[in-house]
Amino acid sequence: MKSIKLVNSPITYFISGRDYSEWILFIHAAFVNHNMFKSQFEYFHNKYNILAIDIIGHGQSTDTQKGDGIDKMSEWIFEILKVENIEKVHIVGVSLGAVLAQDFANHYPNSVSSMACFGGYDINNVDIKMQKQNGAKQKVMILKALFSIKWFAKENKKISAYTLQAQDEFFDMNILFPKKSFIFMASLNSMINKYKTGKRNYPLLIGCGSFDIPMELEAVKQWKISEPNCRVAIFENAGHCVNMDVPQEFNETVEDFWTSAE
């Protein structure tokens, strides 16, 4: 994967090549980086063009300026598409990546071929009670991280992945997360309940692991109720980061979603 820095931004992105007609955009979870999708890169690189990014404050996207925040991610992604002459992308987002995928689709629906969100929730219909519960949990996590990133990463891997291999891989990425990068997440709430979901002109796949927290399973259920036309995938023997826990099942599910939607 070739790494490129987007001019006038903190964002580094990665491209596999241009040999195919369709593009996939992978957006990773919080506290890790684009390498959480390494199994997907291996599987899809000879079928699709791959674009992956490091979210602001993560991986190689830490060269920030005053005023930079996560609320600018959609704008930066759109700039990348313009620079690379990419008209449309199949977006795959996991956890925080699922939030950013939806925010991008809210702003630039005509740049979306399809959207697949895992371990996420419908950002256009967030239950305030759920948001408060989520916020309280995030504050506890931040306190742990500020005390010790290693301690935080040890705790975080248990709720982020189910299999031991995926937990270890998550930990190895999480431990590299800089404490100062928490500040860039502060504007995340600006994406919540800002848009009304209209009729999507692209297919939607949502899902999570069967061992994810009950609140996530409920979020997927509620999202399906509000968008009955979407496809749902619940992955057995997987936790939050389903693409890391069960990569083969994940890859096949996503590929089937794209080919059957054509």
Which residue stretches match the model-derived regions?
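Flexible "cap/lid" loop of the alpha/beta hydrolase fold
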Residues: Q102, N106-H107, S111-L143
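Conserved alpha/beta-hydrolase catalytic His-Asp/Glu region
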Residues: V126-I128, A145-K199
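Gly/Ala-rich beta-loop-alpha elbow adjacent to hydrolase catalytic centers
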Residues: G93-G97, A101
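Alpha/beta-hydrolase fold catalytic core
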Residues: M1-L25, N46-Y48, I86-E87, E255-E262
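Active-site loop/oxyanion-hole signature of alpha/beta-hydrolase fold enzymes
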Residues: L51-V92, E252
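Conserved HGGG/HGGXW glycine-rich cap/lid loop of the alpha/beta-hydrolase fold
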Residues: T12-T62
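Catalytic active-site module of serine/aspartate enzymes centered on a nucleophile-bearing elbow/loop
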Residues: C230-E262
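Conserved loop-alpha-helix segment in the C-terminal half of the alpha/beta-hydrolase fold
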Residues: P203-A238, M244
